């Protein structure tokens, strides 16, 4: 802004330089200090502060005492982007040039203001000093209650802006009561108080310019021309209050210039009286509006305006009716009442959800003139005609509005009055009503299209109103009407869909919905309960947001529910619901490629599954299990039902599902090649599986909602999902579930072989349900990226299984055994996959010990999941564990997950029978994987004799070579077999501790080269990020604190980030390297980047040249070394807080323009 402001002040005091001491004061330092403190504390101690400043300003000629708080936006530097200055704005009224500030005031105030403040009166920073036509016109037009203009004498003017906030409503209410109480002289509230309420409100003293009463006539004429816009209201109401302040003061005190000091003493008592007086008033007025009665206003999106509905409470009408001519004195009270009415304000704001941009429409039918929408207009003050298009003199007059709002019998329902809703009957309308009683609300809440009334009323559906044209579009912009809902309007029904965004439902679907008196679906953003059917989106009208219509009763579904199959929804985002029986009928419908919906689609083989389902879809097996049982409603098909379902129908599985697919549990690594189930091919299923769903999946591959690939239509060909992201909680029944085979690897091809066999549809599920065997079924990893048990062997296909396992236990066990042989490592399991791959033990025990078996099974058939991200309980150990004794899996080495990210401790309670020999190293286990090559979690894989079964034992055995262990991999591979290392951690030199290229966790493996973790043995951990208390001095702990005690070859730790107390000379790059370097002779490693306090203990012998010690490094920041006492303290990087503030540069005077607050 220009450095000089145009307004010259009457006192020609020059603006002081920012930090000059005040000239008038003898103690400049203390006064500045006091001012700073008081300005900071001002908001908190406004009452005390005001009195003091008021009295002070009396004494000081300059008026400097009334300095504005530093917190007012004009003075808050960060607000303005300027450097902080203490600016004194004197409270004395200034004679302002008309062209100077006044122009700015008007032009700026008409700019749209950000809707920061709710109360209008707080918004206007400016006072009008000119009471010429322009200012009065804008004042009158802007005053929310138009009380000013009425006081000025135009009672006939009825144009009142819709109060934008409840605050303005309250102003109107207050002014209502004021005519009687004109006698009340409430002297001005000190303007500081106003600024306190609104920091943007400028504490300008009113000017001596002639009272607005002088230009009364002009203002009245102008005001009648301007319909205030809501924004203007908001920005100006503060001005009105200031103006009225001035006039009242003039009247009361007879002073042309009144300072707030005069009335300060009694303000609090006055305010108290005012509040006591006003609270009853406001509640009276609220009662008039019936707002205090238990009327619940249904704010409903009305897709078409209902012209005849008098039930609709129009805010304008209420305001017009309530606003009666008042004295301007009440305006002065506005600021004071804020506290009294804040609660009421909020309530009102909620009732009329006021938003700046909502257009309220007046009742069109009652009042043809009021039909035009009152939009907030941002009009420049100079332009009187700017509003003309919208609100000219033709705006509804007060009488019209009053007539429109006064309760009078509605033609449609003579009984109802507009404002009375309080009876209990009406209150019921706010509850979910069973739709059996004919309520006004259309049955299908969500459709934006005009909904048919309940079947009884179909004849009465309104003829489409012009707004219905909009309805054809999928998203119609609804009008907001607040209408208390009354049941009784017989002639017309309001089409008031609740807020729902749904492509228009086809008429038949709507009618079906209407017939079934469903409770109105309320807008919920949670996973829909399973009872709700998936959003019915017809394929022809896909929409991004699908509605979840409440699920019909099974009977109804069977009767007539042609709801679009969930699979069809192209992009449904809604919660998944198991599809109803109808879908079975719809099997033909092609599924959409990308449904984000949790669509529980019972897909027939004919339907292609969604390619890209993001929701947790309870994929039903192709045979509609649900059709058989109502249990399906729950989304859980009873296993019996599952068995009932047609086993053979091949169901194409979605190639990739992101949701938990209720369908095939990717997890059934148990399946042996024998089982013919086709693992679902979801490449990427993310869905969570319901237990029943898992059964279903066994019976039929549920398409995983999120398959990335096209589902293979032929079950035979379906490959295990390449990338299943399922969050499936293991079904107890799930043993039959086929697990999506490996995701990433060729294994998918194997699975295709498996796929040939269609998963046994019904019987397996039933078996599973019957037996605990479901427990046996390894829940495929909860977040199985690829269900690790891609190993479902072809034999294990589910079709066979249903045949094999008429009794679920036997079947499951058999399958699992077979599967265990075949269990393919799941390429990418992200969830905690308890892969009890074999479940062999479970076979005999299946029902008895579902969970424990799982753990043991895990041992047996852990497919090595190349990428298990969850705690994959891969008991990599083979099937020998199997209770059956079928060791088919045993021959398998359980592959360790290549990338297990989770807690990959084979949870098997029993140690794997097969010892480390089978344990494969997971190249990348991110969780605790037993000897994972890559464990990212705490891998306590102790391969003692159990083989790689991740014994939960925390003992740090011989480290497996986890290339990437990111967790604490306590993999003490005791077994000589796999690990060259001696299992005891004491062994300093376990042969090649597993060289964990990247161990990020506490790697207690005796000598893992734990790159990132604390590797106790000193492996050459390029990147040890944790405490590496490796006894082996040679182990370079790259990133962790190396406590290499050995002085000899300290690991050259490229990057130790933690305090490395290594006796070794390791130069901890980033940590506090207290390398005591016992042999002082050893050159301390030059730590390029010590970020901690690096105090090399023996500074004398080559102190490490810490290039960049960022901590409290005894050799301070850039010292070459402590030894060089003259060492140049290199660059001083004081990054901490320096409290020194430099003075502003002497030359610059930053004049803060008075008008800047209007920005």
Swiss-Prot record:
Its main location: nucleus. One of its GO terms (biological process) is ribosomal subunit export from nucleus. Nucleoporins may be involved in both binding and translocation of the proteins during nucleocytoplasmic transport. In S.pombe it is required for the nuclear localization of retrotransposon tf1. The keyword Phosphoprotein applies. Residues 263-273 have a biased composition (Basic residues). The keyword Cell membrane does not apply. GO terms for molecular function: nuclear localization sequence binding; structural constituent of nuclear pore. One of its GO terms (cellular component) is mitotic nuclear bridge midzone membrane domain. It comes from Schizosaccharomyces pombe (strain 972 / ATCC 24843). The gene is nup124. This is Nucleoporin nup124. Residues 1-13, 226-239, 442-453, 528-549, 590-626, 657-672, 696-715, 771-780, 798-814, 830-861, 880-908, 927-947, 1001-1019, 1042-1064, 1074-1087, 1095-1108, 1116-1144 have a biased composition (Polar residues). Contains F-X-F-G repeats. Residues 1-28, 44-77, 106-125, 183-273, 426-715, 746-780, 794-1159 are annotated as: Disordered. Residues 642-656, 863-879, 909-926, 948-963 have a biased composition (Low complexity). To yeast nucleoporins NUP1 and NUP2.
């Amino acid at each position: 802004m220009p450095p000089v402001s145009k307004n010259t002040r009457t006192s020609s005091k020059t603006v002081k330089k920012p930090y000059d001491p005040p000239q008038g004061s003898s103690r400049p330092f203390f006064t500045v200090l006091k001012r700073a403190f008081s300005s900071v504390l001002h908001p908190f101690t406004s009452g005390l502060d005001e009195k003091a400043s008021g009295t002070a300003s009396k004494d000081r000629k300059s008026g400097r005492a009334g300095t504005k708080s530093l917190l007012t936006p004009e003075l808050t530097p960060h607000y303005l982007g300027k450097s902080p200055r203490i600016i004194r704005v004197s409270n004395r009224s200034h004679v302002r040039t008309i062209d100077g500030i006044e122009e700015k005031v008007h032009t700026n105030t008409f700019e749209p203001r950000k809707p920061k403040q709710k109360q209008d009166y707080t918004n206007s920073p400016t006072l009008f000093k000119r009471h010429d036509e322009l200012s009065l016109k804008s004042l009158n037009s802007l005053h929310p209650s138009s009380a000013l203009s009425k006081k000025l004498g135009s009672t006939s003017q009825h144009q009142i802006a819709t109060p934008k906030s409840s605050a303005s409503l309250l102003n109107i209410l207050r002014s209502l009561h004021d005519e009687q109480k004109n006698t009340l002289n409430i002297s001005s509230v000190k303007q500081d108080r106003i600024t306190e309420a609104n920091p943007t409100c400028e504490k300008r003293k009113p000017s001596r310019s002639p009272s607005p009463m002088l230009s009364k006539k002009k203002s009245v004429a102008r005001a009648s021309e301007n319909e205030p816009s809501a924004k203007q209201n908001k920005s100006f109401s503060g001005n009105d209050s200031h103006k009225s302040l001035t006039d009242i003061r003039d009247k009361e005190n007879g002073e042309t210039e009144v300072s707030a000091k005069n009335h300060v003493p009694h303000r609090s008592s006055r305010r108290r009286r005012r509040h006591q007086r006003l609270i009853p008033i406001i509640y009276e007025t609220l009662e008039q509006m019936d707002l205090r009665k238990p009327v619940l206003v249904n704010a409903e999106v009305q897709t078409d305006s209902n012209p005849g509905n008098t039930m609709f409470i129009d805010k304008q009408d209420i305001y017009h009716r309530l606003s009666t001519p008042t004295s301007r004195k009440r305006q002065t009270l506005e600021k004071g009442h804020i506290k009294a009415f804040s609660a009421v304000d909020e309530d009102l704001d909620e009732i009329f959800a006021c938003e700046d941009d909502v257009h309220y429409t007046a009742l069109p039918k009652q009042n043809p003139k009021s039909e035009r929408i009152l939009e907030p207009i941002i009009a420049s003050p100079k332009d009187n005609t700017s509003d003309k298009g919208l609100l000219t003199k033709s705006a509804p007059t007060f009488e019209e509005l009053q007539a429109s709002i006064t309760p009078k019998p509605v033609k449609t329902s003579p009984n109802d009055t507009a404002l009375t809703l309080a009876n209990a009957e009406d209150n019921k309308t706010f509850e979910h009503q069973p739709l059996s009683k004919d309520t006004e609300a259309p049955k299908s809440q969500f459709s934006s299209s005009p909904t048919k009334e309940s079947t009884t009323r179909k004849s009465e559906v309104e003829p489409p109103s012009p707004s219905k044209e909009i309805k054809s579009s999928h998203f119609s912009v609804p009008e907001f009407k607040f209408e208390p809902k009354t049941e009784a309007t017989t002639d017309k029904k309001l089409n008031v869909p609740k807020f729902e965004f749904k492509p228009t439902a086809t008429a038949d679907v709507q009618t079906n919905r209407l017939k079934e008196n469903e409770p109105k679906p309320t807008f919920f953003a949670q996973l829909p309960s399973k009872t709700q059917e998936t959003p019915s989106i017809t394929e022809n009208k896909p929409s991004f947001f699908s509605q979840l219509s409440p699920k019909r009763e099974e009977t109804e579904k069977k009767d007539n529910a042609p709801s679009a199959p969930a699979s069809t929804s192209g992009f449904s985002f809604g919660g998944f619901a198991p599809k109803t029986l109808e879908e079975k009928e719809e099997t033909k419908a092609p599924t959409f490629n990308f449904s984000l919906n949790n669509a529980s689609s019972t897909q027939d083989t004919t339907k292609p599954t969604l390619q890209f389902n993001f929701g947790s879809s309870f994929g039903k097996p192709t045979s509609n299990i649900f059709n058989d049982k109502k249990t399906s409603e729950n989304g859980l098909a009873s296993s019996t039902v599952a068995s009932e379902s047609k086993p053979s129908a091949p169901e194409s599985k979605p190639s990739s599902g992101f949701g938990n697919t209720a369908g095939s549990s990717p997890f059934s690594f148990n399946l042996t090649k024998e089982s013919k189930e086709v693992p679902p091919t979801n490449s990427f299923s993310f869905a969570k599986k319901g237990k029943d769903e898992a059964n279903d999946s066994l019976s039929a591959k549920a398409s995983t909602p999120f398959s990335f690939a096209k589902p293979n239509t032929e079950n035979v060909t379906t490959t295990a999902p390449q990338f299943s992201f399922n969050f499936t909680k293991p079904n107890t029944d799930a043993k039959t579930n086929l697990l999506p085979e490996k995701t990433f690897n060729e294994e998918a091809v194997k699975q295709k072989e498996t796929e040939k066999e269609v998963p046994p549809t019904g019987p397996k599920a039933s078996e599973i349900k019957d037996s605990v065997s479901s427990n046996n079924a390894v829940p495929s990893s909860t977040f199985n990226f690829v269900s690790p048990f891609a190993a479902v062997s072809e034999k294990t296909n589910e079709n066979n299984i249903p045949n094999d396992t008429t009794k679920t236990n036997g079947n499951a066990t058999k399958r699992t055994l077979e599967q265990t042989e075949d269990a393919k490592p799941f390429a990418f399991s992200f969830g905690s996959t308890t892969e009890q791959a074999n479940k062999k033990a479970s076979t005999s025990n299946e029902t008895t010990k579902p969970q424990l078996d799982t753990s043991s099974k895990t041992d047996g058939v852990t497919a090595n999941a190349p990428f298990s991200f969850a705690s994959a309980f891969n008991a990599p150990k083979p099937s020998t564990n199997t209770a059956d004794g079928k060791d088919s899996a045993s021959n398998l080495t359980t592959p360790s997950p290549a990338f297990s990210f989770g807690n990959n401790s084979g949870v098997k309670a029993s140690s794997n029978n097969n010892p480390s020999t089978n344990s494969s190293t997971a190249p990348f286990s991110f969780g605790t994987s037993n000897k994972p090559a890559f464990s990212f979690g705490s891998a306590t894989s102790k391969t003692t004799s159990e083989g790689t079964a991740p014994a939960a034992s925390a003992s740090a055995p011989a480290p497996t070579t986890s290339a990437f262990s990111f967790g604490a991999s306590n993999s003490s591979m005791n077994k000589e077999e796999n690990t060259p290392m001696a299992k005891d951690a004491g062994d300093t030199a376990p042969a090649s501790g597993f060289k964990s290229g990247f161990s990020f966790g506490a790697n207690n493996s005796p000598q893992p080269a734990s790159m990132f973790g604390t590797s106790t043995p000193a492996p050459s951990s390029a990147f040890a990020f944790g405490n590496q208390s490796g006894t082996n001095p040679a182990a370079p702990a790259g990133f962790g604190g190396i406590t290499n005690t050995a002085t000899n070859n300290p690991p050259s730790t490229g990057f130790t980030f933690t305090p490395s107390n290594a006796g070794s000379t390791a130069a901890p790059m980033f940590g506090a390297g207290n390398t005591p370097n016992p042999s002082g002779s050893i050159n301390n490693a030059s730590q390029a980047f010590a970020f901690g306090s690096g105090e090399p203990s023996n500074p004398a012998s080559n102190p490490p040249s810490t290039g960049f010690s960022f901590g409290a490094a005894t050799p301070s920041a850039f010292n070459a070394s402590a030894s060089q006492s003259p060492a140049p303290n290199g660059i001083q990087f004081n990054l901490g807080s320096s409290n020194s503030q430099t003075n502003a540069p002497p030359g610059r005077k930053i004049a803060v323009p008075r008008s800047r607050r209007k920005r």
